[in-house]
A protein has these predicted regions:
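Feature recognizes metal-dependent phosphohydrolase scaffolds
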Residues: 1-104
Length: 104
């Protein structure tokens, strides 16, 4: 969470990197408590990453994407009607390759 402001991404010219301050301002202006994004694998990751003071979650569902050894993940969303809240919990989908190691 050390990035501040908006910067060009090293991935390509169209993409941007944005810091925690941008996320915080965007959420405050739009009445949001969480942003969920996808479409970016991180090598060796658990398939999700919580960032920007818990305001941003990156989730990637494809396991072992391009042989990166990453786990996939999904977000489980449930509702608490008493407190009018949504609960969001990551669930890791472990790599089939690693799960099958040693199985004959």
């Amino acid at each position: 969470d050390s990035v501040f402001g908006v910067h060009e991404s090293p991935r390509n010219l169209e993409a941007k990197l944005f810091g925690w301050n941008v996320t915080k301002t965007f959420c405050a202006r739009n009445g949001l408590g969480l942003i969920v994004r996808s479409h970016q694998s991180k090598q060796g990751s658990l398939g999700f990453e919580v960032m920007h003071d818990n305001l941003l979650v990156r989730v990637f569902s494809a396991r072992d994407y391009e042989s990166h050894g990453n786990c996939g993940a999904v977000l489980l969303v449930s509702r608490d009607d008493e407190r009018d809240l949504l609960h969001v919990r990551p669930q890791v989908l472990h790599s089939l390759t690693k799960a099958l190691d040693g199985v004959t």
